Amino acid sequence: MKSNWKYIIVALMLLVLIGIGYFSSRFVLYLAMKIMILSIFAMGYNILFGRTGLLSFGHAAFYATGAYGVALCSMHVHTHPLVGIMVGIAAAAFLALIIGFFCVRHTEIYFAMLTLAFGMMVFSLMWNLRDITGGDDGLSGIMRGSVSLGFLKISITKDSQFYFLVLFFFALSMLLVHRIYQSPFGLVLAGIRENHVRTEFAGLGVKRYRLAAFVVSGAFAGLAGALGLLLESNVTPFAAHWSHSANPVLVSLMGGLQTFSGPIVGSIVFVLLREFIERFTHNWMLWFGVILLAIILGFRGGIVGSTTQLVKRLSKVS
Amino acid sequence: MNNSLLQVRDLSKAFGNVVTAKNLNFSLARGVLTSIIGPNGAGKSTLINILTGFIPPDSGEIIFQGKDITREPIDRRVRLGLCRSFQVANVFGHLSLFENIAIPVLAVERKAKSFLRSVAKDGEVRKEVDKILDRVGLLSQSHVPASALSHGDRRLLEVGIALAARPRLLFLDEPTAGMNPVERTRILQNIRDLSAHGEVTFVIVEHDMDVVFSLSERVIVLYRGHVIGDGTPEQVKGNPQVREVYLGEEVT
């Protein structure tokens, strides 16, 4: 019963997203793509944060690496977007492997500070390596080449065409993250969050699993960054700024850390709220802060977590 | 010597001026249920912590099944067959009992790295987990989160997790502390059965002398980091030094 409901919700969501792709204005398309890209970022991030219990403040570095990866690849190597995305993911995962190697030796606040420090280093590298990254101007005017699969050549120049590529990667990410959560690897990560000493005494090398979670979440951040670049057609070093690292943290917290769909719901709320508030005021951070406070204090376990609990309680009563 | 499972050679450990192990030498034979006893502060917990890899020794060697494991990390010792349970129930609080047991089972079956298969659909793992839950008497609560268990049940689960790692040598740190008589009987019966089977060699650290003397075939008495008595329960009871520093106070 319960799992049937989940499939129905997922099917409905995909139908709605396909509908948006065919019938919506460019503005709605743009918002939907932003939501999906942020969801990919946050879902991957939550493997590390909600599942493994490690709070990273440096994931913008991997997002930016994905974005720069695509940009540089299409400028110097090949304009095929899939090649670019693969390069972006690989670069982000590789950077995550190096940074993670040092970070996973520590936990809690030390881990968070280490990721912050590494993130700022990546930011200043991107800022200073002007010849490669364009410095503070970043890289702009990146064209979307066509997706050519042998005989088939799909143009993604228009937003309404690119939208379906984003949707494809969003659905793929959902599937992958879901499989990871059901898998032995996902269970071990939850074990590490609950009790890392006991996990070690179950015969599992905790550091290696933490590193694996770090790399996986970094790869998803890279994918999100790659798609983000193709959407905006430019990237600046601020994509790697630590304030950008806060986005997946906030999104996961709002939606619900211990849930699969939390980051997605959080992304919807985050993007829409921002869009809505910015129409009325320039200090959107102030109002967003107030709303965030209300959600975190009022909804224990995030929006998804508290709603599920409410539904459970109501169904018990009736 | 063939029958020796674990050998300890000249093991020493001091925290500042406090000596918790001083040139310890002993070996544990396969299948011999051994108890380690001693007054508070005798170095029992430290000894277990050193043997299982929680604390590094200052000097000395630990040989497990002919292999020097003195510098091996915890998880590798566990995979070699050396596991422990904890004094305070050390379980995965928010995970179900099934998941609690599944984690060491996956580790033993070397499936923990797979990230696309579903745990719940793996029949082999489920069978093994159910077997262990049944053994500790918690099968009916397999979907309950561990944090919802009573204290005694959590101790049973703790022993279950340790057993699920399929150890050859298992250290139990006060396995019956905080259990009610029913749970205590169950856990002691389990230890006896498994020990008689010869699959697992148990080493128990206990305060409860009834448990120690009814269960053990061999008793090692620690006092200030030294072994002051070692032998069958009768020999240890008769040892004058042991009576003086330890048994005289508690057992009459």
Task: Describe the role of every protein-language-model region.
Chain B
Residues N2-T252:
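Glycine-rich phosphate-binding loops of nucleotide-dependent enzymes
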